[in-house]
A protein has these predicted regions:
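Membrane-water interface segments at the C-terminal ends of transmembrane alpha-helices
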Residues: 1-29, 40, 44-159, 187-207, ...
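Helix-loop-helix hairpin linking two adjacent transmembrane segments in secondary transporters
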Residues: 225-249
Length: 308
Protein backbone atom coordinates (compact mmCIF):
# COMPACT_ATOMS: atom_id res chain seq x y z
CA UNK A 1 0.00 0.00 0.00
CA UNK A 2 1.64 3.14 1.31
CA UNK A 3 5.13 1.61 1.21
CA UNK A 4 4.74 0.57 -2.43
CA UNK A 5 3.47 4.04 -3.35
CA UNK A 6 6.43 5.63 -1.57
CA UNK A 7 8.85 3.36 -3.47
CA UNK A 8 7.20 4.25 -6.80
CA UNK A 9 7.34 7.99 -6.08
CA UNK A 10 10.95 7.69 -4.87
CA UNK A 11 11.95 5.82 -8.01
CA UNK A 12 10.02 8.09 -10.36
CA UNK A 13 11.19 11.44 -8.99
CA UNK A 14 14.71 10.60 -7.75
CA UNK A 15 16.18 7.34 -9.07
CA UNK A 16 14.97 7.72 -12.68
CA UNK A 17 16.14 11.36 -13.10
CA UNK A 18 19.55 10.52 -11.61
CA UNK A 19 19.87 7.44 -13.82
CA UNK A 20 18.95 9.48 -16.90
CA UNK A 21 21.43 12.20 -15.91
CA UNK A 22 24.37 9.83 -15.53
CA UNK A 23 23.40 7.86 -18.64
CA UNK A 24 23.44 11.07 -20.67
CA UNK A 25 26.72 12.19 -19.05
CA UNK A 26 28.52 9.03 -20.21
CA UNK A 27 27.01 9.11 -23.70
CA UNK A 28 28.76 10.21 -26.87
CA UNK A 29 26.63 12.90 -28.52
CA UNK A 30 27.35 11.65 -32.06
CA UNK A 31 27.39 7.85 -31.74
CA UNK A 32 25.18 7.44 -28.67
CA UNK A 33 27.66 4.95 -27.23
CA UNK A 34 29.48 4.92 -23.89
CA UNK A 35 32.18 7.58 -23.64
CA UNK A 36 34.20 9.58 -21.11
CA UNK A 37 34.80 12.43 -23.53
CA UNK A 38 32.40 14.80 -21.76
CA UNK A 39 34.35 14.50 -18.50
CA UNK A 40 37.72 14.68 -20.28
CA UNK A 41 36.60 17.85 -22.03
CA UNK A 42 35.51 19.39 -18.73
CA UNK A 43 38.81 18.78 -16.93
CA UNK A 44 40.98 19.64 -19.94
CA UNK A 45 39.71 23.18 -20.38
CA UNK A 46 40.24 25.75 -17.64
CA UNK A 47 37.18 27.70 -18.76
CA UNK A 48 35.03 24.80 -17.57
CA UNK A 49 36.84 23.42 -14.52
CA UNK A 50 37.39 26.94 -13.21
CA UNK A 51 33.62 27.17 -12.72
CA UNK A 52 33.83 24.16 -10.39
CA UNK A 53 36.62 25.84 -8.41
CA UNK A 54 34.60 29.07 -8.28
CA UNK A 55 31.49 27.22 -7.08
CA UNK A 56 33.40 25.42 -4.36
CA UNK A 57 35.18 28.60 -3.26
CA UNK A 58 32.09 30.83 -3.03
CA UNK A 59 30.06 28.05 -1.40
CA UNK A 60 32.75 27.43 1.22
CA UNK A 61 33.01 31.16 2.00
CA UNK A 62 29.22 31.52 2.25
CA UNK A 63 29.02 28.51 4.57
CA UNK A 64 31.83 29.80 6.81
CA UNK A 65 30.30 33.28 7.09
CA UNK A 66 26.83 31.86 7.69
CA UNK A 67 28.20 29.69 10.53
CA UNK A 68 29.90 32.68 12.18
CA UNK A 69 26.90 35.01 11.83
CA UNK A 70 24.17 32.46 12.57
CA UNK A 71 25.91 30.86 15.57
CA UNK A 72 26.83 34.22 17.11
CA UNK A 73 23.29 35.53 16.65
CA UNK A 74 21.78 32.36 18.14
CA UNK A 75 24.12 32.57 21.14
CA UNK A 76 23.12 36.12 22.06
CA UNK A 77 19.43 35.63 21.23
CA UNK A 78 19.32 32.51 23.44
CA UNK A 79 21.35 33.66 26.44
CA UNK A 80 20.51 37.35 26.74
CA UNK A 81 17.35 39.41 27.01
CA UNK A 82 16.61 40.95 23.62
CA UNK A 83 13.86 43.53 23.26
CA UNK A 84 11.29 42.62 20.60
CA UNK A 85 12.87 39.15 20.35
CA UNK A 86 9.78 37.58 18.77
CA UNK A 87 9.63 40.26 16.08
CA UNK A 88 13.35 39.79 15.36
CA UNK A 89 12.89 36.03 14.95
CA UNK A 90 9.92 36.53 12.63
CA UNK A 91 12.02 38.87 10.46
CA UNK A 92 14.85 36.31 10.37
CA UNK A 93 12.45 33.62 9.18
CA UNK A 94 10.88 35.94 6.58
CA UNK A 95 14.34 36.77 5.19
CA UNK A 96 14.81 33.04 4.59
CA UNK A 97 11.57 32.55 2.69
CA UNK A 98 12.20 34.49 -0.51
CA UNK A 99 14.17 32.98 -3.42
CA UNK A 100 17.84 34.11 -3.53
CA UNK A 101 17.43 35.76 -6.95
CA UNK A 102 14.99 38.18 -5.30
CA UNK A 103 17.86 39.22 -3.03
CA UNK A 104 20.17 39.67 -6.01
CA UNK A 105 17.56 41.70 -7.89
CA UNK A 106 16.92 43.89 -4.84
CA UNK A 107 20.62 44.59 -4.31
CA UNK A 108 20.92 45.55 -7.98
CA UNK A 109 18.12 48.09 -7.46
CA UNK A 110 19.98 49.46 -4.43
CA UNK A 111 23.68 49.15 -5.24
CA UNK A 112 23.82 48.42 -8.95
CA UNK A 113 25.34 50.82 -11.46
CA UNK A 114 22.09 52.79 -11.55
CA UNK A 115 20.98 51.79 -8.06
CA UNK A 116 19.25 54.12 -5.62
CA UNK A 117 22.11 54.14 -3.10
CA UNK A 118 24.78 54.27 -5.81
CA UNK A 119 23.31 57.39 -7.41
CA UNK A 120 22.67 59.08 -4.05
CA UNK A 121 26.25 58.61 -2.84
CA UNK A 122 27.68 59.65 -6.19
CA UNK A 123 25.57 62.79 -6.57
CA UNK A 124 25.70 63.88 -2.92
CA UNK A 125 29.17 62.85 -1.72
CA UNK A 126 30.91 61.98 -5.03
CA UNK A 127 31.56 58.56 -3.52
CA UNK A 128 31.80 55.49 -5.72
CA UNK A 129 29.74 52.70 -4.13
CA UNK A 130 31.61 49.36 -4.15
CA UNK A 131 30.49 47.05 -6.94
CA UNK A 132 28.01 44.36 -5.92
CA UNK A 133 28.80 42.33 -9.01
CA UNK A 134 31.07 39.31 -9.13
CA UNK A 135 32.30 37.20 -6.23
CA UNK A 136 31.66 39.82 -3.53
CA UNK A 137 28.05 40.33 -4.57
CA UNK A 138 27.29 36.61 -4.68
CA UNK A 139 28.90 36.21 -1.26
CA UNK A 140 26.85 39.08 0.21
CA UNK A 141 23.49 37.95 -1.17
CA UNK A 142 23.85 34.25 -0.34
CA UNK A 143 25.23 34.86 3.15
CA UNK A 144 22.37 37.19 4.09
CA UNK A 145 19.92 34.73 2.58
CA UNK A 146 21.25 31.52 4.17
CA UNK A 147 22.61 32.37 7.65
CA UNK A 148 19.07 31.93 9.11
CA UNK A 149 19.48 28.18 8.53
CA UNK A 150 22.36 28.14 11.00
CA UNK A 151 20.50 30.43 13.40
CA UNK A 152 17.39 28.25 13.51
CA UNK A 153 19.38 25.04 13.98
CA UNK A 154 21.68 26.44 16.68
CA UNK A 155 18.93 28.33 18.53
CA UNK A 156 17.07 25.04 18.88
CA UNK A 157 20.19 23.25 20.11
CA UNK A 158 20.92 25.96 22.70
CA UNK A 159 17.59 25.19 24.37
CA UNK A 160 18.63 21.58 24.95
CA UNK A 161 21.87 22.39 26.80
CA UNK A 162 21.58 21.64 30.51
CA UNK A 163 22.66 24.55 32.70
CA UNK A 164 24.30 22.03 35.06
CA UNK A 165 27.07 21.59 32.48
CA UNK A 166 27.66 25.33 32.37
CA UNK A 167 27.66 25.59 36.17
CA UNK A 168 30.12 22.70 36.43
CA UNK A 169 32.46 24.42 33.97
CA UNK A 170 32.22 27.72 35.85
CA UNK A 171 32.95 25.99 39.18
CA UNK A 172 36.19 24.73 37.63
CA UNK A 173 37.16 28.28 36.67
CA UNK A 174 36.07 28.08 33.04
CA UNK A 175 34.27 31.26 31.98
CA UNK A 176 33.87 33.75 29.15
CA UNK A 177 35.26 32.82 25.75
CA UNK A 178 36.91 29.71 27.17
CA UNK A 179 33.55 28.41 28.42
CA UNK A 180 31.97 28.97 25.02
CA UNK A 181 34.85 27.30 23.16
CA UNK A 182 35.28 24.27 25.43
CA UNK A 183 31.71 23.56 26.59
CA UNK A 184 29.02 25.15 24.41
CA UNK A 185 30.61 24.81 20.95
CA UNK A 186 31.39 21.06 21.29
CA UNK A 187 27.80 20.45 22.42
CA UNK A 188 26.28 22.18 19.41
CA UNK A 189 28.88 21.12 16.80
CA UNK A 190 26.65 18.38 15.27
CA UNK A 191 23.83 20.91 14.96
CA UNK A 192 26.14 23.49 13.38
CA UNK A 193 27.29 20.90 10.85
CA UNK A 194 23.69 19.98 10.02
CA UNK A 195 22.88 23.64 9.37
CA UNK A 196 26.14 24.08 7.44
CA UNK A 197 25.14 21.24 5.13
CA UNK A 198 21.85 23.01 4.36
CA UNK A 199 23.72 26.23 3.61
CA UNK A 200 26.33 24.46 1.48
CA UNK A 201 23.75 22.60 -0.61
CA UNK A 202 21.64 25.71 -1.20
CA UNK A 203 24.64 27.88 -2.08
CA UNK A 204 26.14 25.26 -4.40
CA UNK A 205 22.87 24.76 -6.29
CA UNK A 206 21.84 28.42 -6.49
CA UNK A 207 21.38 29.62 -10.06
CA UNK A 208 19.56 32.94 -9.84
CA UNK A 209 22.08 34.93 -7.80
CA UNK A 210 25.24 34.26 -9.88
CA UNK A 211 23.18 34.55 -13.06
CA UNK A 212 22.08 38.09 -12.14
CA UNK A 213 25.21 39.49 -10.47
CA UNK A 214 27.99 37.04 -11.34
CA UNK A 215 29.35 39.09 -14.28
CA UNK A 216 32.20 36.84 -15.36
CA UNK A 217 32.46 34.87 -12.11
CA UNK A 218 31.21 31.64 -13.62
CA UNK A 219 29.81 28.94 -11.35
CA UNK A 220 28.60 25.44 -12.17
CA UNK A 221 24.79 26.02 -12.24
CA UNK A 222 25.14 28.95 -14.64
CA UNK A 223 27.63 27.06 -16.79
CA UNK A 224 25.34 24.01 -16.96
CA UNK A 225 22.41 26.21 -18.02
CA UNK A 226 24.50 28.00 -20.65
CA UNK A 227 25.72 24.73 -22.15
CA UNK A 228 22.28 23.15 -22.11
CA UNK A 229 20.61 25.99 -24.04
CA UNK A 230 23.59 26.31 -26.40
CA UNK A 231 22.49 26.42 -30.04
CA UNK A 232 24.97 23.65 -30.85
CA UNK A 233 22.98 20.44 -30.60
CA UNK A 234 25.49 18.17 -28.82
CA UNK A 235 25.86 20.22 -25.64
CA UNK A 236 23.13 18.48 -23.61
CA UNK A 237 25.40 15.51 -22.87
CA UNK A 238 28.20 17.81 -21.77
CA UNK A 239 25.79 19.74 -19.52
CA UNK A 240 24.69 16.41 -18.03
CA UNK A 241 28.32 15.54 -17.29
CA UNK A 242 28.78 18.84 -15.46
CA UNK A 243 25.58 18.22 -13.49
CA UNK A 244 26.82 14.72 -12.63
CA UNK A 245 30.04 16.23 -11.25
CA UNK A 246 27.96 18.53 -9.04
CA UNK A 247 25.92 15.56 -7.79
CA UNK A 248 29.12 13.69 -6.93
CA UNK A 249 30.58 16.70 -5.09
CA UNK A 250 27.45 17.36 -3.02
CA UNK A 251 26.98 13.65 -2.26
CA UNK A 252 30.58 13.45 -1.03
CA UNK A 253 30.09 16.48 1.22
CA UNK A 254 26.86 14.96 2.55
CA UNK A 255 28.52 11.64 3.43
CA UNK A 256 31.48 13.43 5.02
CA UNK A 257 29.12 15.52 7.15
CA UNK A 258 27.19 12.42 8.25
CA UNK A 259 30.45 10.66 9.18
CA UNK A 260 31.68 13.59 11.29
CA UNK A 261 28.29 14.10 12.98
CA UNK A 262 27.96 10.41 13.85
CA UNK A 263 31.36 10.52 15.54
CA UNK A 264 30.68 13.71 17.48
CA UNK A 265 26.97 13.47 18.30
CA UNK A 266 25.62 12.45 21.69
CA UNK A 267 22.19 12.73 23.32
CA UNK A 268 21.37 15.86 25.31
CA UNK A 269 18.46 16.34 27.69
CA UNK A 270 17.85 19.75 29.15
CA UNK A 271 16.60 19.19 32.69
CA UNK A 272 17.36 22.82 33.48
CA UNK A 273 17.69 25.08 30.43
CA UNK A 274 20.35 27.77 30.52
CA UNK A 275 19.23 30.98 32.19
CA UNK A 276 18.66 34.12 30.17
CA UNK A 277 20.85 37.00 31.36
CA UNK A 278 20.37 40.76 31.18
CA UNK A 279 23.32 42.57 29.64
CA UNK A 280 23.79 46.12 30.92
CA UNK A 281 25.48 49.35 29.94
CA UNK A 282 27.06 50.13 26.61
CA UNK A 283 27.51 46.43 25.79
CA UNK A 284 23.74 45.98 25.89
CA UNK A 285 23.27 48.92 23.51
CA UNK A 286 25.93 47.62 21.10
CA UNK A 287 24.41 44.12 21.15
CA UNK A 288 20.94 45.43 20.30
CA UNK A 289 22.22 47.78 17.58
CA UNK A 290 24.22 44.99 15.87
CA UNK A 291 21.33 42.50 16.01
CA UNK A 292 18.79 45.01 14.70
CA UNK A 293 21.20 46.16 11.96
CA UNK A 294 21.87 42.59 10.81
CA UNK A 295 18.17 41.75 10.65
CA UNK A 296 17.37 45.04 8.90
CA UNK A 297 19.99 44.40 6.20
CA UNK A 298 18.69 40.83 5.82
CA UNK A 299 15.19 42.20 5.24
CA UNK A 300 16.26 44.63 2.49
CA UNK A 301 15.23 42.31 -0.39
CA UNK A 302 11.70 41.91 0.99
CA UNK A 303 11.38 45.65 1.69
CA UNK A 304 12.61 46.58 -1.78
CA UNK A 305 10.17 44.18 -3.43
CA UNK A 306 7.30 45.62 -1.38
CA UNK A 307 8.37 49.20 -2.17
CA UNK A 308 8.81 48.65 -5.90
Amino acid sequence: GVTALAIVIFGLFLIYPLFSLFASAFQNAETGGFSLENFVRFFERKYYYQSMINSFWVTTCVTALAIVIGTTLAYFMSLYTIKFKNAVEICIIISLLSPPFIGAYSWILIGGRSGILTQFLQETFHYEFPSIYGFAGILLVLTLKLYPFIYLYVAGAMKSIDSALIEAAESLGCSGIRKVATVIVPLITPTILAGALMVFMNAMADFGTPMLIGEGFNVMPVMIYSEFINEVGDQANFAAAMAAIMVIITSTIFMLQKYVVNRKSFPMSSLRPMQVHQMTGIRNVIMHVLIYALVAVSMIPQLVVIYT
